[in-house]
Amino acid sequence: MKRVLMLSTVASLQDQFNMANIRMLRNLHCDVHVACNFVQGNNTSPQRIAVFQNELAALGVTCHQIDFARSPFHLLQNHRAYQQLKAVLRADAFDCIHCHTPVGGIYGRQAAAAFQIPVIYTAHGFHFFQGAPLWNWLLFYPVEKYYARKTDVLITINSEDYDRAVRKMHAKQVVRIPGVGLKPGKYRFASRSREEVREALDLPLDAILLISVGELNRNKNHRVIIQAMARLPQLPLYYILCGKGKEAEFLQELAQSLHLSNRVRILGYRQDVCDLLHASDIFCFPSKREGLGM
């Protein structure tokens, strides 16, 4: 039986983007292990993470808590996490490591090289791209180029990343997979009416309702929508944000400073996104960078 380690910085990435791979590997009778931080840094709720762990257990997947920090600048914490990762690799003989996220990719490929384990790295959108800040190029490009040499298969999800990886990086193999797929039918029908959803959220039935779904961080750039709303006081605009993250408090304070606190609602992690989309009028997608914008 082949033993595969799925590695990422945080558990929410595995939950949101990697479950199809995990199920496929289990269907192929592989012994699957998931190593990541189940405790900190996740962009979903602790309750969702607990459910996710139960789902993994039901599939027969082994979980390992690795205390990664999401930021590459938390060197001490990530060094400790790297020691934890090496302990996992010493305990079991793995046939392959599949790593995700920049931090997971760095330490995963470093460990794979040390233990001579074949490694796959999925780049969910490089931080360097045409039009990216110079700082991104100075920091991330040399690191990704260096670790590409330690990569057996480098998976990209957009054409710009693929073309650059083929031309400039030296992974043994570079492939492009156009994302994780989309199920339009999943969002075709709501379980509640538009009116019911708005009443539950205490929103006017005649409001122009904006919605964004995703982690609340600077890259997602939700602040620009709130600032735009302040410039259109004549319109009955309301904005709901589904997600959690470090920007939540800032966004609440920004809305208050612009006298929009009653029109901007941060709902946190939601499992009724389909209903919320049907109750909304405009989907807002103001990200500065997306590996695969849909």
Task: Set out the residue ranges of the language-model regions.
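Aromatic "clamp/platform" in nucleotide-sugar-dependent glycosyltransferases that forms part
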Residues: 269, 288
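N-terminal strand-loop element at the rim of the active site
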Residues: 6-77, 160-168, 174
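A short helix/loop element that forms part of the nucleotide-sugar donor recognition site in Leloir-type
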Residues: 49-54, 187-203
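Short His-centered aromatic/hydrophobic patch
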Residues: 99-104, 123
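Donor nucleotide-sugar binding/catalytic pocket of nucleotide-sugar-dependent glycosyltransferases
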Residues: 145-194
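Nucleotide-sugar donor phosphate/pyrophosphate-binding loop at the beta->alpha transition
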Residues: 76-83, 118-120, 128-146, 150
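A conserved mid-protein helix/loop that constitutes part of the nucleotide-sugar donor-binding site
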Residues: 15-23, 208-231, 246-252, 294
